[in-house]
Amino acid sequence: MKFWTKEEEQDIQKIEKNPVRSFSAPDNVDGAKEIHTNLLAPQLGHAIIPSDAQSEGTIPVKELIKSYRALAEYHEVDDAIQEIVDEAIVYENDKEVVWLNLDNTDFSENIKAKINEEFDRVVSLLQMRKHGYKWFRKWYVDSRIYFHKILDKDNNIIELRPLNPMKMELVREIQKETIDGVEVVKGTLEYYVYKQSDYKMPSWMSATNRAQTSFRIPKDAIVFAHSGLMRGCADDPYIIGYLDRAIKPANQLKMLEDALVIYRLARAPERRVFYVDVGNLPTQKAQQYVNGIMQNVKNRVVYDTQTGQVKNTTNAMSMLEDYYLPRREGSKGTEVSTLPGGQSLGDIEDVLYFNRKLYKAMRIPTSRAASEDQTGGINFGQGAEITRDELKFTKFVKRLQTKFETVITDPLKHQLIVNNIITEEEWDANHEKLYVVFNQDSYFEEAKELEILNSRMNAMRDIQDYAGKYYSHKYIQKNILRLSDDQITAMQSEIDEEETNPRFQQDDQGF
């Protein structure tokens, strides 16, 4: 931790030398726990532990993550999560899972080659080919993911060790000073608190005693990526996950499925009705007589919502609750009849409705949800079209990938600076131009490109009669076919070359 402590000392020195002052702290975009103080940490390594008390309406991180993980165990939610993760992390035999695009950066070719080498090293440390699916799914479900950077003697990362998100907390210490009677913000110092124990320490306990179960970690020692979704007031925001929208529809779907099974078990079979002749027995003895007969033939069936099993004492599923009605002497005598079962037990439209509602809450096209006559999914065939929902879903997945790429770019930044490949200033100037490209499904991409090209060809045929009269050929190339100037020049050069090539010349029959 000595390297990270030194880095934190440099951050403190930057705060001291920073001439910028403001009455407001920078926006809290990472959901950090804020501490306001007029003094920085007197001694690095000693924890400054925030109070365990939660603001009104704030859900503890541990409870939030537990609720998301429990939700992900429902098979309908798990299927929906798999749709998202499969779209974000694509495995193909001849392609990498993720690669780096440096075309828009200001680096030289030599520097770009070194950056790509370090990028491959980081991808290898994360084992994206093997564990990329697991990391992305864990990040999506928990709404956050942490890795500890473990260094060798040369300060190179040799391992990225995953940490339990329920034991981590990001703290932002807001350094203030008073100028002319006005309290202004001098700077901010961020660090992590790792809670070794789940025991909730009282706020009055000293920092020394609290540090026995919690300790402070410099910010640069941890790789942290979160969903980017916030809830709570501006003074105390906290991170929520993308599954937060799915909690209500998922619980409604599960409740409806359980209720539907119970209803069908109760109403599907025909029930027996026993009319028991009690003769002239007194009311009390008549009731005892009916109860005796009932106990001899009674069978109660219980449905277990946890396992989906039907349990009873006799293990006979054909029998349910029966009706026992006494009859007085002079009636028809003892009789056993049946009540018909329920009707329309095959209707599951309400279940399919809540299943579609769950997919909508998770921003997944409802065409991928299972329906009554098909299993769901994307179907491309003759005349098939890519719907607007699919395009919106593709954009949503790209936003998720952009949030997740911090898992790769954070350790990449460390490697580049430690090995003196680039400076921190060069990273700050170019990191927005550096693109982490995730592999996409080839079949889907080809189908999308073919559909776009087909639409452009149809539009070009419709406007062909007006070419050279109302619209120039260059206008058609740039606005209908969407070709760039370089593409137009290259295309014209290829056309001129093919005109002199006998292979592309037509014969007398037009071939």
From Swiss-Prot:
GO cellular component: viral capsid
Entry keyword set: Capsid protein, Late protein, Viral capsid assembly, Viral contractile tail ejection system, Viral genome ejection through host cell envelope, Viral genome packaging, Viral penetration into host cytoplasm, Viral release from host cell, Virion, Virus entry into host cell
Subcellular location: Virion
Subcellular location, principal: virion
Region forming the signal peptide: none
Alphabetical list of Pfam families matching this protein: Portal_T4
Subunit structure: Homododecamer. Interacts with the large terminase subunit. Interacts with the major capsid protein. Interacts with the capsid vertex protein.
Protein function: Forms the portal vertex of the capsid. This portal plays critical roles in head assembly, genome packaging, neck/tail attachment, and genome ejection. The portal protein multimerizes as a single ring-shaped homododecamer arranged around a central channel. Binds to the terminase subunits to form the packaging machine.
Protein name per UniProt: Portal protein
Organism, as annotated: Vibrio phage KVP40 (isolate Vibrio parahaemolyticus/Japan/Matsuzaki/1991)
